[in-house]
Each structure stands twice: as structure tokens, then as C-alpha cells.
Curated annotation (Swiss-Prot):
<dbReference type="InterPro" id="IPR027363">
    <property type="entry name" value="M1Pi_N"/>
</dbReference>
<comment type="function">
    <text>Catalyzes the interconversion of methylthioribose-1-phosphate (MTR-1-P) into methylthioribulose-1-phosphate (MTRu-1-P).</text>
</comment>
<keyword id="KW-0486">Methionine biosynthesis</keyword>
<dbReference type="Pfam" id="PF01008">
    <property type="entry name" value="IF-2B"/>
</dbReference>
<dbReference type="GO" id="GO:0046523">
    <property type="term" value="F:S-methyl-5-thioribose-1-phosphate isomerase activity"/>
</dbReference>
<comment type="similarity">
    <text>Belongs to the eIF-2B alpha/beta/delta subunits family. MtnA subfamily.</text>
</comment>
<dbReference type="GO" id="GO:0019509">
    <property type="term" value="P:L-methionine salvage from methylthioadenosine"/>
</dbReference>
<feature type="binding site">
    <location>
        <begin position="230"/>
        <end position="231"/>
    </location>
    <ligand>
        <name>substrate</name>
    </ligand>
</feature>
<feature type="binding site">
    <location>
        <position position="83"/>
    </location>
    <ligand>
        <name>substrate</name>
    </ligand>
</feature>
<keyword id="KW-0028">Amino-acid biosynthesis</keyword>
<feature type="site" description="Transition state stabilizer">
    <location>
        <position position="140"/>
    </location>
</feature>
<feature type="binding site">
    <location>
        <position position="179"/>
    </location>
    <ligand>
        <name>substrate</name>
    </ligand>
</feature>
<dbReference type="InterPro" id="IPR011559">
    <property type="entry name" value="Initiation_fac_2B_a/b/d"/>
</dbReference>
<dbReference type="InterPro" id="IPR005251">
    <property type="entry name" value="IF-M1Pi"/>
</dbReference>
<protein>
    <recommendedName>
        <fullName>Methylthioribose-1-phosphate isomerase</fullName>
        <ecNumber>5.3.1.23</ecNumber>
    </recommendedName>
</protein>
<dbReference type="InterPro" id="IPR000649">
    <property type="entry name" value="IF-2B-related"/>
</dbReference>
<dbReference type="InterPro" id="IPR037171">
    <property type="entry name" value="NagB/RpiA_transferase-like"/>
</dbReference>
Amino acid sequence: MDRVLPFRFAEEEGVFWLLDQRRLPQEEVYVPVRTAREMAQAIRDMVVRGAPAIGVSAAFGMVLAHLAGEDLEEADRRLRASRPTAVNLFHALDRMRPFWGDLAGSLLEARRIWREVEETEAAISRHGAQVLWGQVLTHCNTGPLATGGYGTALGAIVEAYRLGRVRHVWVDETRPYLQGARLTAYELQKAGVPATLITDGMAGWLMARGAVDAVVVGVDRMALNGDFANKVGTYALAVLAHHHGIPFYAALPLSSVDPRLASGEGIPIEERSPEEVVAFRGVRIAPEGFPAYHPAFDVTPHRYLTGIITEKGVLYPPFAEGLRRALGLD
């Protein structure tokens, strides 16, 4: 896959360069981040997004805090508050804590986290490719831009295409931030995978016409029973796929599983500014003063899942047993 990575670290400059994903696909612009404060703001503003990529960025945010002489407790707090739903953020910061005050150790651990993301996603792509075929539908963005590695759901799709199993991809535009239209379409085009963009509301009609053979999505946080949070709109896709008898898969690294949660009821759902719904790139698309509601994620019950694609293989029901075993909790 012709990867465009969401970041790079210039150690000699003490700068973490982020590809500003808000400006894609029209422009590929990298912005410099020099402090943990700036990193937290960049994560909040979605300069960088996607659960694994946020985790890697937060880890390097703590490296920047050392380099900039910031208060480490405050830096950690700011980064944790930047996006509440993606559990990878918290896992990465937990791993960085033992290295507070140790710049060299912090840098080694941040690089280790990034390397593990790449290794994990290569495995997810291999396993996921074995269960996808024909025409596949996906939602939001789960490629290298969202992860810093090879991608989760999109990595599996690209590998399945390479193996001759998948022939075409339906890409939900993913309102209101248009991650599908702006980012997934961009990555699939670079990878040379045949794909077609659709509005979110078209998915059910395509399923009814027999034009979808499987659905695969990413995960921002999964509970131990398999309930999971992903970009808002995922729940509707799961219900539609179930109604039409279409396999529905979630692809994720096991680091996206929150072992503290027995079910999806405890997953915090980020609510973003209504302005992101009523306006796009500064252009208002709704009447002035008209209210909007903007939960960034929804929770899909595990009963709608056919399988969970992880770096250790594809898990099938009962998911609680499989996840506990994969996490080494039994």
C-alpha cells in the first residue's frame, strides 16, 4: 500500500510534524508541534485523528513535554482530556508514565509504541483479508492516516484486494467531518483499489440490492463483551447489515479493548461542537441560529457483529470468552 503517514518525528529539531488531515485531500501540509500543549490542541482539533494515531501522537507529546521543559503532570492531564473516547490515548500515556523525567527512556518507549502499531496492523491486515470478499462497504477512515501503521479495517481491505478477494469498495462519506470522502477515498485512490463514494444514507439501499458482500469498520474503544464505539453512523450500518444478512466485522488492535468495561454502556461518548454539523470549512449549510447535535461516536452492540478482526486472528461469538483469552485475562 502506498502509505501517507500522519506524522514524523524530527529528533534533531525536537519537532513532531503532523499531516494536517483537515486540509486533505486538496493539500498535503505538515504542521510543527513542539510542546505537549500544542499536541493536545492538535488532537482536539483533529489535525491528527484515529485511535491508534492519537495514541502514538500522545506518546510523542510526552517526549515533547520533556524537551520543552513542561510540567509533566500537566502535560499528561492535557493530553488525556483531548479526546475522551479513543482508549489507545490512555494506554499510550499509561505506558509513558514510568519514563517521566527520563528523556531517553521516553523517546525509546514512544518509538516502541509506534513500531508495535505497525507490526500489529500488518497482522490485522493479513487476518482480515481472509474473511473479506467481493464488494465491501466501510465507514469513516481506518487506513494509515488514522493509525500511523498500515491501517485496521482499510488495511484488511487493501490486502484482500491485493489477494484478489475484494474487487470493489463502497466508501461512506461519513458526515459531518467527511473522513470517508476526504481521507478513505484519498488512501484507496493512492493504493489503486477500485472504490465508489456514497452518502451515508445510501448504504441500506445498496444492501437491499445485493451490492454489498461484507461490511468492515474500525473501533475506537471496545468493551469486554464486544460492544464497541466507532464513528457515529456505525450502529445504523450494523443494524442494516444484520437485517440483510450481510457479515459485519470490526477490525482493531487489542489495545483498543478496555478491560475495565464489561459492556458498551460505560464507554464515554465525545460530543463535539454543533458548528461542525451546521458548517463545513467555514461555509454555513444550515440556517443561522438553527440548533444541531453532534455526538462523534455511537456504540454498536456485540450481537450485530459477525467477527472481530485482531492481530491474534478473527474472533467469533461468544466474544467475551475470545477477548479475555486474547488479552490473557483467563
